[in-house]
């Protein structure tokens, strides 16, 4: 267990906190050590290294860039922020120069672009959390990696599902930069920029990336909830009933409005549920290929569960029919996603 519960009844549900009990190790495995043991495909190893280099570059850029409005709109008509453009440019530079990536698409401009590499189709959200980044809150990068031969088209995307991914990766940029990745046998977390005072490799040396968590697991039950799209509760009675259940049963609210921090916490607290149903007046906003499928692969690899919010089935089984396809989503601890299905869809 890496978290503990402290309850102060006089403060009500908000007085229930989940603190880490993770103790500092004398040394930590290197990125190369973990990849060598837990990623058999050499081409995929190279792709992961490239993606982590991109996350490192975005980290450094966020530390120095001001958050300002650019003079451009993205494909959805939203004003782009300086940090959105910087992060997306870093990802495009990486993807277009990669020997492993054959096709790429960004959430900022959801059109598949042919690249010069060999094996993979990569979709990414360069900086998830644009609406909260000006607050200096945690934001992130989401990446899904598909073989280029999946699906029905030459780019490997249309006709594919999230279950076809060979790797997914989410970076969280907060006081520290950490990245969770699906490898052959589970989910691993890597931390960036460790110092001699922080952590070191077994041989006493220091590298940009060390493995800070091995084979992360998400428990079946949770007392933490992250309710997105609460407007949907106005015309979705089941969602209002679910929110009332959380409050009546003294669940702890942990919600920032950013998909990355709100779901990533499930890998540090080892529990949680993120709910984002849709309704006629509150339509789907999450993007299947850029957000839901990559996170779904990570959560299910860690023992969690997902729901597509329509059939109650896994988000990983939804066929990608459009690059910019939107979807509902419930994701997290298995029994909590089951509760979502039961209350929202009577499944």
Predicted regions and their residues:
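IMPase-like, lithium-sensitive Mg2+-dependent phosphomonoesterase catalytic core
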Residues: 2-69, 79, 85-347
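Short, surface-exposed loop/turn segments at secondary-structure junctions
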Residues: 73-77
